[in-house]
Amino acid sequence: MKILVINCGSSSLKYQLINPETEEVFAKGLCERIGIDGSKLEYEVVAKDFEKKLETPMPSHKEALELVISHLTDKEIGVIASVDEVDAIGHRVVHGGEEFAQSVLINDAVLKAIEANNDLAPLHNPANLMGIRTCMELMPGKKNVAVFDTAFHQTMKPEAFMYPLPYEDYKELKVRKYGFHGTSHLYVSGIMREIMGNPEHSKIIVCHLGNGASITAVKDGKSVDTSMGLTPLQGLMMGTRCGDIDPAAVLFVKNKRGLTDAQMDDRMNKKSGILGLFGKSSDCRDLENAVVEGDERAILAESVSMHRLRSYIGAYAAIMGGVDAICFTGGIGENSSMTREKALEGLEFLGVELDKEINSVRKKGNVKLSKDSSKVLIYKIPTNEELVIARDTFRLAK
């Protein structure tokens, strides 16, 4: 069984060829700068530890996918004889709106429904659709499955997802909290439940911390609240995104500085967060080095970020009536021992006891970070969104 997993951005295409039953990754890679000068392909055959990087023009996603297929089927460095060996194709789709609470086989009606949500994710959904249509064109007859970032959070109740705006804004404009990183939160909370012995009842907080960051309360295997909202701008302070701020501050800054809507949107999404407060970089590693060196703005940025993360952990423990486990995932969550330690400072009242010695050692895989005496399990769990997409595609396409 071979599933091709596609994650299409506006100028990028990530791919993996996976066996969802054995979890074996045959090949993976990335096409970037599609439609821009300096287009690049990265191709890796995992079992052979073979990597290739190629700079070649890719005017569109069609040329990018053709290049991927030619490498996958190459006689010398390929992993399949032809695309006939690809059983189905799974696509990451960022926004499923209220229409999709789970992954679906793609047909014309599904394509139209995804397109109808373009307003909710103007940077992502059109690119996702482009990837789907390109696969349909180049590999006709293959089953395609859409796996939505928002689907896992469709179990939230109205008290968690409604905004206290006039009700017609929800009914007519679909303005509400949707949440993102759902595939990651689903996977990590599922692994945590397995570690716990798959109990009937569980209260898990998952912290997906990367350049984009979100936190989710997962009760009995279902998302009951999450930090991101209508868009990925709400919630935690991130690399370049502001997260939660007073909406009136947006209008105040916009008017005082004479900014257009697009400029204000750019300011909140690309110039805020760690970059905005620290001023030198949006990279967590640069921030941590500057904190160690005593940079005052770095210390400020880190303390604001950790204060907000701790606030969410406490709030979600309150919403669920306690917490059994706290999990860290994502590039920062998995690799930054400082972030994990600072995030849990002051949470001893919840029964949280971090083993700082184990936390400071870099280990791969699922790692227990809590002391044996801790009432709350603390784990570092690498996410695997591609595997979730492959499994759902296999389940729906077989």
UniProtKB/Swiss-Prot annotation:
It is found in: Cytoplasm. The active site is at residue 149. One of its GO terms (cellular component) is cytoplasm. Mg(2+) binds at residues 7, 385. The keyword Kinase applies. Pathway: Metabolic intermediate biosynthesis; acetyl-CoA biosynthesis; acetyl-CoA from acetate: step 1/2. PROSITE patterns: ACETATE_KINASE_1, ACETATE_KINASE_2. Mg(2+). Can also accept Mn(2+). Its cofactor is Mg(2+); Mn(2+). Its EC number is 2.7.2.1. The record marks 181, 241 as: Transition state stabilizer. ATP binds at residues 14, 208-212, 283-285, 331-335. Substrate binds at residue 92. GO terms for biological process: acetate metabolic process; acetyl-CoA biosynthetic process. Homodimer. NCBIfam families: ackA. Belongs to the acetokinase family. This is Acetate kinase. It comes from Fusobacterium nucleatum subsp. nucleatum (strain ATCC 25586 / DSM 15643 / BCRC 10681 / CIP 101130 / JCM 8532 / KCTC 2640 / LMG 13131 / VPI 4355). The lineage of its organism: Bacteria, Fusobacteriati, Fusobacteriota, Fusobacteriia, Fusobacteriales. The gene is ackA.
